[in-house]
């Protein structure tokens, strides 16, 4: 049996990050379609600054189809069983971000593995986002650029990034197009990835942070983004920011994750 794409010139990405590859589905999950991707990139997988391992699997995701603007897409939502890993919970009351809003300590016992679950109302803001950072100033920026309809994750200052200078581009990427389509491109590791989004009033965002990764799931997995990061110590502080107006964080829970 031969399958042909009805739109060979249209790419619908399952994940918009740099480090989602070789997705494998399980065959014994009943009516559910559950997949696990490899979390790395052939551009730099052999030179990442790790000792005990070179790569790992990302979180298992449940795949499903949905329709948007008369187009069919594949969503990838974290499987609900991940909730059993939640240990400590920190619930932060609703707040408005007019310029910035600081959270000086995310979790009391933070070893670098946690989940952030947020519900956001856009308001008048053009840019709305937050930085996860540590005492050394290493940070990851995650933000919505609403005029350009983009969700962005910027890891250019996330920690150890200089090994990216030795990245080897894929054969199809030897031209410079990847440099112009990325945001804040420094090299094939130090950059920002982005996903197209619909401009909506409310967004639900799940962010999973581990010792060397950040995985984003927007609106139940309609957008997923997986990126490696290598901070020298866990991100335990947070700063929300806005430009062009304010936005509202209606719900915000932080969970320490563990076995």
PLM region spans:
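Short, small-residue-biased leader/transition segments that mark boundaries at the very start
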Residues: 1-2
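Beta-rich accessory regions
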Residues: 7-18, 24-259
